[in-house]
């Protein structure tokens, strides 16, 4: 596979090399990236802002050169070349992975996806995905999405936890997809953001692929699609706001992009500027959070067979709850 090249932007200045690559190569796990670094498939060239020689020699025919270390600190203006092996086509099979199934019947299932789990197989993720877990735990799944996405009607980012509805047959899939398309499904998230955000704020900004970094989305892209996000509730904490966020559209990275665009990125979101900030007391839980503080907490849809409106709530997972519990003013908020 041809090498991918990334110029380190300002928001990643001072980051470890492996953490930077985890952020820009969203479809690859940290262990895969660390192996690529160890095998010499990653090169770092010192940027012009700091001067100095490249981190190592010119690219050779296969690996990019002598290995650098995963904990190498990169800086704004550095150039990182990555050569990842082409994905090997594999048959998708069920795997005995833990899966929190909140509800299921003959038509649908509702699951609580953990953070760190990719929804479906793709480049660098032939196993360990939600689809692999679904194939093990459920006997029937729709085939509309193709062999790699059975049952999948909508998605969550790898780093986002929370609720997803899964279709068990094609008729249910088509009806649920229609509801998402016609904006009849209600989706609400809980996110912790930097700064003070007021309830009632509406963010109406089209989203498209970022021209400078193809792994990112942008609210300033040339070819963009409508996207609307609303802050429905907000609880202020020192330097932070815990928000309840509703989305009317379902664009890739929508909440993360929109909140970053208004200057209030999600805590822990390295890709969109949510790291390297400090709060009162230098809260360690915030500093060590390695994924965006974003959780799909509420899902409301119409049952595809009998027309019932079905509402599901998923409480914050333990890693996010621990962050809240360590924040000044949270435990004594009442």
Named regions from a protein language model:
Residues 155-158, 223, 235-237:
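A short beta-turn/loop motif at secondary-structure boundaries
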Residues 1-211, 293, 313-330:
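RNA pseudouridine synthases
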Residues 45, 234, 246, 302-304:
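A generic structural motif
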Residues 109, 241-243, 297:
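Short beta-strand micro-motifs in enzyme catalytic cores
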Residues 67-68, 243-246:
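Short histidine-centered loop motifs in beta-beta connectors
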Residues 226-231:
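Oxyanion-binding "anion nests"
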Residues 176, 251-259:
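Short beta-strand segments enriched for Tyr within beta-sheet-rich domains
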Residues 1-35, 212, 216, 222-225, ...:
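Pseudouridine synthases involved in rRNA/tRNA modification
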């Amino acid at each position: 596979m041809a090498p991918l090249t990334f110029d380190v932007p300002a928001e990643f200045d001072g980051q470890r090399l492996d953490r930077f690559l985890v952020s820009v190569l969203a479809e690859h796990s940290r262990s895969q990236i660390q192996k690529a670094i160890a095998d010499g498939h990653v090169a770092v060239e010192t940027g012009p802002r700091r001067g100095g020689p490249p981190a190592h020699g010119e690219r050779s025919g296969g690996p990019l050169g002598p290995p650098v270390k995963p904990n190498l600190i990169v800086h704004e203006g550095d150039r990182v070349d990555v050569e990842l092996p082409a994905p090997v086509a594999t048959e998708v099979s069920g795997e005995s992975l833990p899966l929190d199934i909140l509800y299921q019947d003959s038509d649908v299932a509702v699951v609580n996806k953990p953070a760190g789990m990719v929804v479906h197989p793709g480049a660098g993720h032939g196993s360990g995905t939600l689809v692999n877990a679904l194939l093990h735990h459920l006997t029937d799944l729709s085939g509309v999405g193709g062999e790699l996405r059975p049952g999948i009607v909508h998605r969550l980012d790898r780093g986002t936890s929370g609720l997803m509805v899964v279709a068990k047959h094609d008729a249910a899939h088509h009806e649920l997809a229609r509801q998402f398309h016609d904006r009849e499904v209600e989706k609400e998230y809980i996110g912790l953001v930097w700064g003070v955000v007021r309830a009632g704020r509406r963010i109406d900004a089209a989203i498209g692929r970022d021209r400078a970094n193809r792994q990112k989305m942008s609210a300033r892209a040339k070819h963009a699609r409508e996207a609307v996000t609303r802050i429905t509730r907000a609880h202020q904490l020192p330097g932070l706001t815990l928000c309840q966020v509703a989305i009317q559209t379902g664009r890739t990275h929508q909440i993360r992009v929109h909140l970053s665009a208004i200057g209030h990125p999600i805590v822990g979101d390295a890709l969109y500027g949510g790291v390297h900030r400090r709060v009162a007391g230098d809260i360690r839980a915030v500093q060590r959070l390695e994924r965006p503080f974003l959780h799909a907490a509420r899902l409301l849809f119409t049952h595809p067979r009998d027309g019932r409106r079905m509402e599901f709530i998923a409480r914050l997972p333990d890693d996010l709850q621990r962050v809240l519990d360590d924040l000044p003013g949270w435990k004594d908020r009442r």
